[in-house]
Swiss-Prot record:
Zn(2+) 1 binds at residues 68, 70, 157, 178. Keywords: Cytoplasm, Hydrolase, Isopeptide bond, Metal-binding, Nucleus, Ubl conjugation, Zinc. The gene is Ints11. This is Integrator complex subunit 11. It is found in: Nucleus; Cytoplasm. InterPro entries: Beta_Casp (IPR022712), INTS11-like_MBL-fold (IPR041897), IntS11_C (IPR048662), MBL (IPR050698), Metallo-B-lactamas (IPR001279), RibonucZ/Hydroxyglut_hydro (IPR036866), RMMBL (IPR011108). The RNA endonuclease activity is inhibited by BRAT1 that forms hyrogen bond and hydrophobic interactions with the active site. Its cofactor is Zn(2+). CDD domains: INTS11-like_MBL-fold. Sumoylated; sumoylation regulates its subcellular location and is required for integrator complex integrity. Component of the Integrator complex, composed of core subunits INTS1, INTS2, INTS3, INTS4, INTS5, INTS6, INTS7, INTS8, INTS9/RC74, INTS10, INTS11/CPSF3L, INTS12, INTS13, INTS14 and INTS15. The core complex associates with protein phosphatase 2A subunits PPP2CA and PPP2R1A, to form the Integrator-PP2A (INTAC) complex. INTS11 is part of the RNA endonuclease subcomplex, composed of INTS4, INTS9, INTS11 and inositol hexakisphosphate (InsP6). Interacts with WDR73; interaction is required for the assembly of the RNA endonuclease subcomplex in the cytoplasm. GO terms for biological process: RNA polymerase II transcription initiation surveillance; snRNA 3'-end processing; snRNA processing. The active site is at 203.
Length: 600
């Protein structure tokens, strides 16, 4: 019995270090290869020993797929390929291929050059890892080998994010990565067709959340920022380099222009330029409004937002600073936070999810005394606000995607256990499908029913349409035709088309039975008597008298002939195909009983 096996190596009942091992019809695929931002030791990387205890990873894995450039989805990639050892193909979209190495190098600098961490990948390892990448286009079916194929779908979330369908024969799995079912100011909504996979693996970060109106959230955000700078305070907004950062920059830029505000807004050095470059390069990945206006006005060339210098953090007076990274776990955002945390006039606005173990998660949980590096204590007096501008699907969006894809089963990853359990029950109740939520290292095995996909010729469908026999939606219907197999693909076509394609002449197998009838009339008159008798007897059948004197009932042919030895006897030749054997037998019996007497 074919089966699908799924083992989360990371993001199983957890958010961070996304890494899921999928085995489908003998093919092994690793989905994402992320790091956990809450750890600074070996726990930051997935446990790759689950993949295989012996032998090379390249021999076991058929391919690796990366859904997008966030480090909790790609951060362990150089460690995995260059330090653990993997030489096979790594698939990702073109924007992810361009942006991923930049973020990996930025994080490496923080971890190694500034913190002095050991057992970490080098700059050269990042370059060598990226040489193994195969970039894919949206909706492009990529043949990994003779049996395994993958296809990317638009996921929203960040520039270049994609959901992937993995298919082997008739078995398929869809992995969402992170996605957003709601369009925002610079990206469109996630979309997938009704692909009906055996299994849908979906993120569940906001498994129990249904977001309020986006307009209300934006108004609340602008109000809090404005009130803080009005009283002379500073606002820190920790963000990741690309994605939510651009969303909030567009929002503040528009507000500053409308209100004619002079308070400076800063963005981490270099990131504005990088964002401009990549959004221009991959403009087709943005939403329709950005694409339409890009030629006349680049939405990412900001008038009020300037590059940030670290010395600006000590400047007196109000300011707004977008700084990376988004969870306050390292880098410039953490440095600024430490400087501003002691002033109650200031505010930090956390616009996205923070994983456990990060400073962002600690302050959102209510901690106001933090132990920093070197066992130094930091008292947080500044205001802390959480305002979800997350580019993840909420509970409503997850349910919408499940309904759109129509999977046979669902598996939840990238979420917190209690919230996932609530969503799991909701999915099972509403869609009547099995839903799983394995922990890291736990394997879920799903038996699949083998099926053979069959293409149906347009001619056969048109014939059904002409006859008015098209089925109602979701109601099964039998189609009769000839099944042709070519290059391991099956097609159902009409018998005429099959003969033509195969270069065969049409042959027909008919059965003929002789019925002796006492009748002195000529053969034509006997045939006419047969026609009249059958016409009056068989009200529900098509009975015809042909010009050559023969009679037909559906596909059954009846001909009258003289008896070779007895002039007073006629021979009725009744012939039929095997499809009409029952009707042929009935007519033979009927005629053997004789014809009614003709009026004299």
């Amino acid at each position: 019995m074919p089966e699908i096996r799924v083992t989360p190596l990371g993001a199983g009942q957890d958010v961070g270090r996304s890494c899921i091992l999928v085995s489908i019809s003998g093919k092994n695929v690793m989905l994402d290869c992320g790091m956990h931002m809450g750890y600074n030791d070996d726990r930051r990387f997935p446990d790759f020993s689950y993949i295989t205890q012996s032998g090379r990873l390249t021999d076991f894995l058929d391919c690796v797929i990366i859904s997008h450039f966030h480090l909790d989805h790609c951060g362990a990639l150089p460690y995995f390929s260059e330090m653990v050892g993997y030489d096979g193909p790594i698939y990702m979209t073109h924007p992810t291929q361009a942006i991923c190495p930049i973020l990996l190098e930025d994080y490496r600098k923080i971890a190694v050059d500034k913190k002095g961490e050991a057992n970490f990948f080098t700059s050269q390892m990042i370059k060598d890892c990226m040489k193994k990448v195969v970039a894919v286009h949206l909706h492009q079916t990529v043949q990994v080998d003779d049996e395994l194929e993958i296809k990317a779908y638009y996921a929203g979330h960040v520039l270049g994010a994609a959901m992937f369908q993995i298919k082997v024969g008739s078995e398929s799995v869809v992995y969402t990565g992170d996605y957003n079912m709601t369009p925002d100011r610079h990206l469109g909504a996630a979309w997938i067709d009704k692909c009906r996979p055996n299994l849908l693996i979906t993120e569940s970060t906001y498994a129990t959340t249904i977001r309020d109106s986006k307009r209300c959230r934006e108004r609340d955000f602008l109000k809090k920022v404005h009130e803080t700078v009005e009283r002379g305070g500073k606002v820190l907004i920790p963000v990741f380099a690309l994605g939510r950062a651009q969303e909030l920059c567009i929002l503040l830029e528009t507000f500053w222009e409308r209100m004619n505000l002079k308070v400076p807004i800063y963005f981490s050095t270099g990131l504005t330029e990088k964002a401009n470059h990549y959004y221009k390069l991959f403009i087709t990945w943005t939403n329709q409004k950005i694409r339409k206006t890009f030629v006349q006005r680049n939405m990412f060339e900001f008038k009020h937002i300037k590059a940030f210098d670290r010395t600006f953090a000590d400047n007196p007076g109000p300011m707004v600073v977008f700084a990376t990274p988004g969870m306050l776990h390292a880098g410039q955002s953490l440095q600024i936070f430490r400087k501003w945390a002691g002033n109650e006039k200031n505010m930090v606005i956390m616009p996205g999810y923070c994983v456990q173990g990060t400073v962002g998660h600690k302050i959102l949980s209510g901690q106001r005394k933090l132990e920093m590096e070197g066992r130094q204590m930091l008292e947080v007096k500044m205001q802390v606000e959480y305002m979800s501008f997350s580019a993840h699907a909420d509970a409503k969006g997850i349910m919408q995607l499940v309904g759109q894809a129509e999977p046979e089963s669902v598996l939840l990853v990238h979420g917190e256990a209690k919230k996932m359990e609530f969503l799991r029950q909701k999915i099972e109740q509403e869609f009547r499908v099995s839903c799983y939520m394995p922990a890291n290292g736990e394997t879920v095995t799903l038996p699949t029913s083998p099926s053979i996909p069959v293409g149906i010729s347009l001619g056969l469908l048109k014939r059904e349409m002409v006859q008015g026999l098209l089925p109602e939606a979701k109601k099964p219907r039998l189609l009769h035709g000839t099944l042709i197999m070519k290059d391991s693909n099956f097609r159902l076509v009409s018998s005429e088309q099959a003969l033509k394609e195969l270069g065969l002449a049409e042959h027909q197998l008919r059965f003929t039975c002789r019925v002796h009838l006492q009748d002195t009339r000529k053969e034509q008159e006997t045939a006419l008597r047969v026609y009249s008798h059958l016409k009056s007897t068989l009200k529900d059948h098509c009975v015809q008298h042909l010009p050559d004197g023969s009679v037909t009932v559906e596909s059954i042919l009846i001909q009258a002939a003289a008896h070779s030895e007895d002039p007073g006897t006629k021979v009725l030749l009744v012939s039929w195909t095997y499809q009409d054997e029952e009707l042929g037998s009935f007519l033979t019996t009927l005629l053997k009983n004789g014809l009614p007497q003709a009026p004299s």
